[in-house]
Amino acid sequence: MKKVLIAGVTSGSGKTTAVLGILKALNEKYTIQSYKVGPDYVDTKFHTRITNRPTRNLDNYLVPDPQVLNYLFTANTENIDLGIIEGVMGLYDGLGTDKDAYSTASIAKQLNIPVILVINARATSTSAAAILKGFIDFDKKVPIKGVIINNVMSENHYKLIAGAIHRYLDLPILGYLPHDSTISLPSRQLGLVPDDELPNVDKKIAKVAEDVKAHVDLQKLLSLATSVSEKVVDPFNIPKTRLRLGIAKDKAFNFYYADNIHLLEKTGIELIPFSPISDNHLPDVDALYFGGGYPEEFASRLAANEFLKKEVYEFSQANKPIYAECGGLMYLGKVLKQGENEFPMVGIFDGMSEMTPRLKRFGYCEAYTQVDCMLGNRGQKIVGHEFHHSMFKQLDQQLKPVLLMKKVRDNQIVDTWSGGYQIRKTFASYLHVHFYQNPKLFIQFLNNLGADVQ
């Protein structure tokens, strides 16, 4: 497999647009595995829509062991021609001010992936060359090999910028993408609106692909891609087990890392999908798994499905294991509030999720278990990330948080809070967790779900 990383100078540079167009243009001829740097769930779905292959996240905060991350990058790539990695934010943006703290640049260096920068050309000409020179000089170990100029207003505008880059830099220009307001993808509180909620998304992607074919030198891009080194042996040697795990999968619940799903299945877990929106009954399973998503967008339909809410509540009452992240916590609470509207949810946890106009939590965080719970025994450290526009409030003060949360930036604790709740064998929190962070932690998690892994 050849590999190449598309990174932005800043957020909003157009890297997602460029990646979607490149994926669509090359997918007609090549077998492509796409990746996304960082913890994002939504962009990956757009990739998968094009490639028909689960997109994988590359995150060296959530997966701190370099050998494990290298394995996740190279696994199952025997029949792949090209790996295309989309960066996150700007190239050097990560956690705090350290350019190597979980940034796209740190991934490029760690996995030795050549970088193609995307720069927004709006209202600039020669200054684009200065910006690019700054990016190249800022860290010479980052293999920046080319640039795509986005949001170009005219052919003359492109020639002006390209001329400046050629004059001051020895950096290949792969081409440009013209300004086109009709191809922009709408956003909401957690980033882009998911692809399956956009009726014209395929037309927009096709239009970007046409622009890529017309104005970007794809052969030059392919020539800059380098080969992946030999495959890494899976460092997670988890014994096989057997368990039927019901997994909530519909428009309200769909935030799952492809590698988490793969690891569960590889361990012998049988995943049985069900829809909290439309199914009247739970499948015959040993445990339940609710990922994140957008329950607030489908609150009325979730609230109206009394049959399934009752079965989920009774599942918990029967002391069967339930694990829930973010949107799953909102669903398992008593009420989901949006403005003046209150929607009754499952009611396992006597608390209310209330939507807020601004992000309440955003980014990487550390969780420390205060009691034995689904995620681990007391005193266990778990890394993850939170990203939500809601707050969960206990309606009964007997409901106590089981996690102490910390945000650490530049080696300083900048925020602490409490979160996560467990009643019987039901656990829910706002924390999103990557299962590949710690094999012992994962084995303990499986056993808490009801598996028997020694």
Curated annotation (Swiss-Prot):
The record marks 432 as: Increases nucleophilicity of active site Cys. The keyword Disulfide bond does not apply. Keywords: ATP-binding, Cobalamin biosynthesis, Glutamine amidotransferase, Ligase, Magnesium, Nucleotide-binding. Residues 244-440 form the GATase cobBQ-type domain. InterPro entries: CbiA/CobB_synth (IPR004484), Class_I_gatase-like (IPR029062), CobQ/CobB/MinD/ParA_Nub-bd_dom (IPR002586), GATase_3 (IPR011698), P-loop_NTPase (IPR027417). Its cofactor is Mg(2+). It catalyses: cob(II)yrinate + 2 L-glutamine + 2 ATP + 2 H2O = cob(II)yrinate a,c diamide + 2 L-glutamate + 2 ADP + 2 phosphate + 2 H(+). The active site is at residue 326. CDD domains: GATase1_CobB (cd03130). Its EC number is 6.3.5.11. PROSITE patterns: GATASE_COBBQ (PS51274). Pathway: Cofactor biosynthesis; adenosylcobalamin biosynthesis; cob(II)yrinate a,c-diamide from sirohydrochlorin (anaerobic route): step 10/10. SUPFAM superfamilies: Class I glutamine amidotransferase-like (SSF52317), P-loop containing nucleoside triphosphate hydrolases (SSF52540). Comprises of two domains. The C-terminal domain contains the binding site for glutamine and catalyzes the hydrolysis of this substrate to glutamate and ammonia. The N-terminal domain is anticipated to bind ATP and cobyrinate and catalyzes the ultimate synthesis of the diamide product. The ammonia produced via the glutaminase domain is probably translocated to the adjacent domain via a molecular tunnel, where it reacts with an activated intermediate. Belongs to the CobB/CbiA family. PANTHER family: COBYRINATE A,C-DIAMIDE SYNTHASE. The a and c carboxylates of cobyrinate are activated for nucleophilic attack via formation of a phosphorylated intermediate by ATP. CbiA catalyzes first the amidation of the c-carboxylate, and then that of the a-carboxylate. Catalyzes the ATP-dependent amidation of the two carboxylate groups at positions a and c of cobyrinate, using either L-glutamine or ammonia as the nitrogen source. This is Cobyrinate a,c-diamide synthase. It comes from Limosilactobacillus reuteri (strain DSM 20016) (Lactobacillus reuteri).
